[in-house]
Amino acid sequence: MSEPEVTYSTVRLHKSSRLQKLVRHEETQGPREAGYRKCSVCWQLIVKALGILCFLLLITVAVLAVKIFQYGQHNQEIHETLNYHHNCSNMQSDFNLKEEMLTNRSIDSRPGNELLESLNREQNRGYSETKTDLDSSQDTGTGVKYWFCYRTKCYYFIMNKNTWSGCKQNCQHYSLPLVKIDDENELKFLQFQVIPDSYWIGLSYDKEKKEWAWIDNGQSKLDMKIRKMNFKPGGCVFLSKRRLEDTNCKNSHYCICGKKLDKFPH
């Protein structure tokens, strides 16, 4: 009896074209997604770095702006101080010129020389009278710091903050009124003296007349300038190194009293 024949065969499964494309797509998609993730991380780092850089630039610009502003203010103060010294120098030069003219005229005219001496004596006498009046007044704890005379006026600085009415009473104690500023030159001179504080002066709002008035009800060459300042009715005026300013009369500032030496011979 013969043995049966055994037949072997190999079975090959052919993938469809669609399945092959899907496999190829999956094989290529993996590296692409990995590349995209790497690029995304890089961009995030770049954006963060740019954000930090912009923030630092903003801070730098802000600091520079503050420095420039402070530098401008400092230059303005220096300019104002130089202008004041220039004005004071001009005023002193004018005074010296007038004095020199009178002195020169005294060579040819004795009356001119006598007039000059009389003016000097009268101013010195007024200075002495003011000093005597102030020294003879009893100290009431008003914090008087210093006083001085300039040109035709003597000024008394009371370094104790008070209301406008309080400063008025303190000045009256020394037989003086709150200071009246007569012109622009006197204003600039006093502004240089009050650095860096603020002081009440003899200017307040008269509710009956409904206008700003000096304490002696007199006139000043500053009246036109004061009207242009548009002060609010009902207040009082104080002086600082930069300006005249109106405020509530019950606020506290230092005081300036003043006396005019107006007893000159005719």
UniProtKB/Swiss-Prot annotation:
Cystines in this chain: C149-C154, C167-C255, C171-C257, C236-C249
Pfam families: Lectin_C, Ly49
GO biological process: cell adhesion
Membrane-crossing residue ranges in chain numbering: 45-66
UniProt entry keywords in alphabetical sequence: Cell adhesion, Disulfide bond, Glycoprotein, Lectin, Membrane, Receptor, Signal-anchor, Transmembrane, Transmembrane helix
Extracellular side: 67-266
Assembly behavior: Homodimer; disulfide-linked.
Official protein name in the record: Killer cell lectin-like receptor 6
